[in-house]
Structure formats: structure tokens, C-alpha cells
Swiss-Prot record:
This is Deoxyuridine 5'-triphosphate nucleotidohydrolase. SUPFAM superfamilies: dUTPase-like (SSF51283). Involved in nucleotide metabolism: produces dUMP, the immediate precursor of thymidine nucleotides and decreases the intracellular concentration of dUTP to avoid uracil incorporation into viral DNA. Belongs to the dUTPase family. InterPro entries: dUTPase-like (IPR029054), dUTPase-like_sf (IPR036157), dUTPase_trimeric (IPR033704), HSV_DUT (IPR034745). One of its GO terms (biological process) is dUTP metabolic process. Its EC number is 3.6.1.23. The lineage of its organism: Viruses, Duplodnaviria, Heunggongvirae, Peploviricota, Herviviricetes.
Length: 326
């Protein structure tokens, strides 16, 4: 069986179960998932009114090239069931009546298990009726090279005067991994409903404008109720992001603990990650439209009923939960 690195670029092998329906939209960049069944978002313990994290099986397995990653996101509002539109240009997206929230998740190219979403809902019994949950898988191209990172003040006129400090702050990754791990620079205790600001004293040289660094959370952190606000690393600014504690009790992180991941992207959509620092939105939603940035290469979501045969083998296989794994 072929390696994942041999999968043709811009082709994603997809297996979708009967409990969800799927279709490609937005010039192929987006695979829309709509529930055919009632999704129960129920807390296992606690009291009504608390904000619970629930791991939701979204009914698909996917395999993409190692040069890509897939971002799982909540679509803004609901999609009409009949008739199916050819695009999103004439579709309105009502407010999310179910009051559930979905954390951004990263599906690595090597993951072969069922994709799962980390979702949050208030109260202990929240049900989402059939056709009322709309999620999306967005294909993102990864940059082939890393960026040149220097300490604050060492970049002048676009030129760097120090050695590259990239791997001093970001752990090396495997070929099948989408992101580079970011470790907490210090111990911290985050109070309920409060944010912790992580600010690494480094900047990157914007020598390659095609590369856009973006910071995402980790599934294990999401499940603990610690949400990294997904954001860009803006050129000329330090590498900074917020971690929000949505629990009703303090949660501690320790120095060296993996708390986030850095993705180096080539064609990130502004509708997915806006070109500014995210200060206040832990659960962004993706709003596709005619202005949605088309991928550099046409994307083919290849549906199959024999995923294990058609998807290339991988070292990770179904290890971890996915989106990113726990």
C-alpha cells in the first residue's frame, strides 16, 4: 500500500457514514457535513448551566496528501436541505438555534480514524435535531519550508541579523503532522472564564509572503476546556495567542506543556483565519460565500465505500481521536 506522501495533491479520499451527509462546496475547498440523526450533546456530570465539552463523531474518515491539512470548523448557521444549491451565493445562514459551539480542529494527513469534533453546549442535555448541525472540513495547503525566526529587535528592514531560532521555540514535526508543537513558556493558572496571554519573544521575517503562520489549539486542551483562540502570527509581531478557560474552576498549565500548534500555510482563507490577531473569539465559524478564496489547485473529494483499500497507509493510522488526536 502506498505511503500518504504518494497521494496525488488536492485529492482527498473520503468515507462518509449514513448518519451524516456530505458534499463539496466553495470551489472544492470545503466539504460540508450535515447530520442525518439527532446529535446528543450531553454532559456526563455537573449541574445545569455549565459549559460541557463533548466529543462528537462526525461520521467521516479522510486521507489527504502530507502537503495538506484539514481544518474542522462549524459552518455559520444551517444549510437548506432541499433543493441543494450549486453554491452558497444565494444561501442565508440563520443563527445557531441549538446554541452549541465547535472548537477548530486539525486533521493531520496521517490520521485514518473517524474524525471527531470537540463541541461545547450549556446545560446537561442539548439535542441537535437532524439537519440542524452544519460542520465543515476545509483543505489547507502547507508550506514546504519553515520561516526564519529571530528574537525581538533583530529584524531590520526585512533582513535578519541573527541565526534562525525556529526550533528553539517549536518542536520538530513528523512528515504526517500538520503543525509544530508550541510549549507553554511558564507555569500558569487560568481562572474560570478568564484568558491567559502567551507571548513568545520572537518575530519572523516576512521574506516569503506566500507563507502564513497560523496558531491553533490541540484536541487534548479543548477537551480540558482550555481553548486556544485560533489566530494568525502577524508579520512584525511577537508570536502571541490567548488560552481561554471555559470551565467553572481554575485550570493550571505547566512550563513545557504542549498547549498549541503552529501551522505554516500557503493559501489560508481569510474567512477561516482573519489577517489579524484574534483577541476575543474562541469559537470562530466559517462563512463560505462567492468571495471565498479558491484553492490554488482544484480539490477533489473522492468518496469511497472501501476507505481502507483506497486510502494510503500511514504511520499514525487511527491512533488518537482526531481532529488532531488526544
Amino acid at each position: 500500500m502506498a505511503s500518504v506522501t504518494n497521494l496525488v495533491d488536492s485529492i482527498v479520499v473520503v468515507e462518509c457514514g449514513e448518519r451524516w451527509r456530505a458534499r463539496a462546496e466553495a470551489a472544492g475547498r470545503l466539504l460540508v457535513l450535515i447530520n442525518n440523526h439527532t446529535v446528543e450533546l450531553s454532559g456526563e456530570h455537573g449541574s445545569a448551566g455549565e459549559f460541557y465539552s463533548v466529543l462528537t463523531d462526525v461520521g467521516v474518515r479522510v486521507a489527504c496528501s502530507s502537503g495538506y491539512a484539514i481544518v474542522l470548523t462549524q459552518i455559520s448557521g444551517l444549510l437548506p436541505v432541499e433543493p441543494e444549491p450549486g453554491n452558497f451565493s444565494n444561501v442565508t445562514f440563520p443563527e445557531n438555534s441549538a446554541k452549541y459551539y465547535t472548537a477548530y480542529g486539525i486533521v493531520d494527513s496521517g490520521y485514518r480514524g473517524v474524525v471527531k469534533a470537540v463541541q461545547f453546549a450549556p446545560g446537561i442535555n442539548t439535542s441537535v435535531p437532524p439537519g440542524q448541525m452544519s460542520l465543515g472540513l476545509v483543505l489547507v495547503k502547507l508550506a514546504r519550508k519553515s520561516i526564519h525566526v529571530t528574537s525581538i529587535g533583530s529584524t531590520r528592514d526585512g533582513r535578519t541579523s541573527e541565526a534562525n531560532l525556529f526550533y528553539d521555540y517549536f518542536a520538530p514535526k513528523r512528515v504526517e503532522d500538520a503543525g509544530y508543537d508550541i510549549s507553554a513558556p511558564e507555569d500558569a493558572t487560568i481562572d474560570p472564564d478568564e484568558s491567559h496571554f502567551v507571548d513568545l519573544p520572537i518575530v519572523f521575517a516576512n521574506s516569503n509572503p506566500a507563507v502564513t503562520p497560523c496558531i491553533f489549539g490541540r484536541s487534548s486542551m479543548n477537551r480540558r476546556g482550555l481553548i486556544v483562540l485560533p489566530t494568525r502570527w502577524v508579520a512584525g509581531r511577537t508570536c502571541c495567542f490567548f488560552i481561554l478557560n471555559v470551565n467553572k474552576y481554575p485550570v493550571s498549565i505547566t512550563k513545557g506543556q504542549r498547549v498549541a500548534q503552529l501551522l505554516l500555510t500557503e493559501d489560508i482563507d481569510d474567512a477561516l483565519i482573519p489577517p489579524t490577531v484574534n483577541y476575543d473569539n474562541p469559537f470562530p465559524t466559517y462563512s463560505p460565500s462567492e468571495s471565498t478564496k479558491a484553492p490554488q489547485s482544484p480539490v477533489l473529494w473522492k468518496f469511497t465505500t472501501d476507505f481502507d483499500r483506497e486510502a494510503p497507509s500511514s504511520l499514525r493510522a487511527d491512533g488518537g481521536f482526531g481532529s488532531t488526536g488526544l
